[in-house]
Amino acid sequence: MFNKQTNAIVLLFTFALFATLAVATPTIVARTGGSGSSCPTTDIKCCSHVGTFSEVQGYIDDDTKVKLIPALLGLLGATIDVVLGVVLGVTCSSISVGSSCSATTVCCENVVFNGLINVGCTAIDIL
């Protein structure tokens, strides 16, 4: 159906697309320490699962959405140092002050995939 020239163009386009994605993909750098004293209201999240990677691992086997997390982190080239205890928030949604959260309210430093994975989270109380 396709001739050799069309196949070559499709192959070249596919290669260029993946090369562009590899270069343009952000790298997550999980911070440790920090002041942790303030959280902009735009960064407040309500996460279904919060914990270190090993703590969240139990949910990865049970929750269909969460099964993709190791693969997504691998694609991003992210390295999460389990020894440092970097806290992840999984399947999070943005909330505003005064809103309720039936799960865990957190403030996270890095948000990936529109809240599917959040890195460097700290639990907070919304009054």
Curated annotation (Swiss-Prot):
Signal peptide extent: 1-24
Keyword Plastid belongs to the record: no
SMART domains: HYDRO
Pfam families, per database record: Hydrophobin (PF01185)
Keywords from the named record: Cell wall, Disulfide bond, Secreted, Signal
Top-level lineage group: Eukaryota
GO terms for MF: structural constituent of cell wall
Location in or out of the cell: Secreted; Secreted, Cell wall
Protein purpose: Aerial growth, conidiation, and dispersal of filamentous fungi in the environment rely upon a capability of their secreting small amphipathic proteins called hydrophobins (HPBs) with low sequence identity. Class I can self-assemble into an outermost layer of rodlet bundles on aerial cell surfaces, conferring cellular hydrophobicity that supports fungal growth, development and dispersal; whereas Class II form highly ordered films at water-air interfaces through intermolecular interactions but contribute nothing to the rodlet structure.
Family under the similarity heading: Belongs to the fungal hydrophobin family.
This protein's name: Unclassified hydrophobin 5
Organism the protein comes from: Pleurotus ostreatus (strain PC15) (Oyster mushroom)
